[in-house]
Amino acid sequence: MATGDDSFPWDQDSILSRDLFSATSTELCYENLNRSCVRSPYSPGPRLILYAVFGFGAVLAVCGNLLVMTSILHFRQLHSPANFLVASLACADFLVGVMVMPFSMVRSVEGCWYFGESYCKFHSCFEGSFCYSSLFHLCFISVDRYIAVSDPLTYPTRFTASVSGKCITFSWLLSIIYSFSLLYTGANDAGLEDLVSALTCVGGCQIAVNQTWVFINFLLFLIPTLVMITVYSKIFLIAKQQAQNIEKMSKQTARASESYKDRVTKRERKAAKTLGIAVAAFLLSWLPYFIDSIIDAFLGFITPTYVYEILVWIVYYNSAMNPLIYAFFYSWFRKAIKLIVSGKILRENSSTTNLFPE
């Protein structure tokens, strides 16, 4: 699945939209080529601001998710099936920051694709692969949290490392196979040959997607989304009931120490809440883009390019959101960051450091 200008052609709207940001005169991507795409560059001020905003997002996505992966893979205390899913999700977001955002940044600001026709298609495949991989990871994480909250005592025997590994493998393989096969078989632009031919120019990266595949893409987004909403609704109800039960028991045994089950339940509820926020952030970031894709496909690409650019970069910025959410809610992640940044992670036996408060 392509996003951004990959699936929306540069046309007069893109030229007009840049006037909103004080665009200079219209130029060509490649001045010496007859088939060059037209570009309408931003004036220096807005150009610098856009590079700063987009570049900051890429750096945040790379560094933040690298910290998440390093924390989970290095510290033995974090070696759990659920955390391996989180690390794999961070890997998808990390790859967005490395392999997608820098190239999209240049394309968005300069109005041209300077990285070759082959990488244009790869870039679009990477976008789709990482998008669906993140979505499937979040779906499996929601199921994991449901099991943990609904039955915390038997949870370790139900969601094992083997189950986690299968979820990770499924998330990556299905996403990659679907995205690459869609674009490399040409199924995405079947019936749009005339449009593709008319839009093709040197310095452009237009990946057209017909109505059928736009609808299928939307279904692939919608079905896991409905699963996550349903599961987290159940988690909310269970957590509410558990909180009421704990409150009743605390009144009856005010001086009694907290049971192991109660401690586990509280910990799992907090994890479910944090990951639920991550899911909500993902859906809020992606839903406007998918809705706009449906509208464009069936109404003839009516969205102005600058609006499309905004939607796409909201999607990209989602890849930088999860580490910020973890840092805000998880004390163990904040402690892990301090150890990594200070270099204490290089000390002998640092992997056995206790990251959880007593």
From Swiss-Prot:
Gene3D superfamilies: Rhodopsin 7-helix transmembrane proteins. Changing residue 132 to L/T: Decreased trace-amine receptor activity in response to beta-phenylethylamine-binding. The chain crosses the membrane at residues 48-68, 84-104, 122-143, 167-187, 213-233, 275-295, 310-333. The keyword Transmembrane helix applies. One of its GO terms (molecular function) is trace-amine receptor activity. GO terms for cellular component: plasma membrane. The gene is Taar7d. This is Trace amine-associated receptor 7d. Changing residue 312 to T/C: Decreased trace-amine receptor activity in response to beta-phenylethylamine-binding. Disruption phenotype: Mice lacking Taar2, Taar3, Taar4, Taar5, Taar6, Taar7a, Taar7b, Taar7d, Taar7e, Taar7f, Taar8a, Taar8b, Taar8c and Taar9 show no visible phenotype or behavioral deficits. They however show an absence of aversion to low concentrations of amines such as 2-phenylethylamine, isopentylamine, N-methylpiperidine and cadaverine. Glycans are attached at residues 34, 210. Residues 69-83, 144-166, 234-274, 334-358 are cytoplasmic. It is found in: Cell membrane. Residues 1-47, 105-121, 188-212, 296-309 are extracellular. PANTHER family: HISTAMINE RECEPTOR-RELATED G-PROTEIN COUPLED RECEPTOR, TRACE AMINE-ASSOCIATED RECEPTOR 7A-RELATED. Belongs to the G-protein coupled receptor 1 family.
